[in-house]
Amino acid sequence: VLKDAASAALYGSRGANGVIIITTKQGQQDSKATVKVKATLGGSSRAVRDYDRVNTNLYFELYWEALRNQYAKSSDYTPATAATQASKDLVTKLMGGGPNPYGTQYPQPVGTDGKLAAGARPLWNSDWSDAMEQQALRTELNLSVSGGGKANQYFFSAGYLNDKGIALESGYQRFNLRSNVTSEMTSWLKGSINLSFAHSMQNYPVSSDSKTSNVITAGRTMPGFYPIYEMNTDGSYKLDDNGDRIYDFGSYRPSGSMANWNLPATLPLDKSERMKDEVSGRT
């Protein structure tokens, strides 16, 4: 810390309140080589819990009510026939030609009273938000070697950081190297060289609120009765020739329900990366 005349002599009026000089790590004179290793492991998660959402049963009942009210406005329907038509059209309106989440046993899962049929239960409940999140582990490793003799001091360090984000295919990696060597060549001549290098890679999915590729918005928007994977009528997964599950892109979904879209399937393919190399030196 430089204060008063010392700071004024170097920095003028800008140093009137004092100057703090930050120096990089360096080796100690007349010291044996010291090796330090530091490893940390941690994780991160969402600090604020997401909104509560309606489940499949309540969603179907509310949508039935909306259909019934829509039909009841028309002179072609009485209150009773509007309720009957709403029950008939409910699955088609929500699922198009896709699978009925209540199975073939319940072609009309909501009755004319607007209540779920007795015994009806969803055969699946897809958690789109969970499918687009990952374990956000943070790993950091640092190694340093320092020491020196009467005339020379040295400090070398290397570091690695891998910080995964909570969103699928998001994260940050960094590799860094640093060296600081000081040599007293004569009683009146002293030299030093300080070099550093850092290589970083950042992966980040699109985060604009208006885009369906926003993992947070998409997870909140997609109801659980739209399956992530193709389903059989009994609620089991359809499998390909290798026995793997098949992503459901929802070509049957009605307009406004993100037809032909499956972000958990496409996120690993839609790379959004930023790489940066930084080199600096000082003598």
Which positions does each model-derived feature cover?
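A beta-strand signature from Gram-negative outer-membrane beta-barrel systems
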Residues: V1-K36, E133, R138-E140, Q153, ...
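Short, glycine-/polar-rich solvent-exposed loops and beta-turns at beta-strand/coil boundaries
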Residues: Y11-A16, S170-Q173, S207-D209
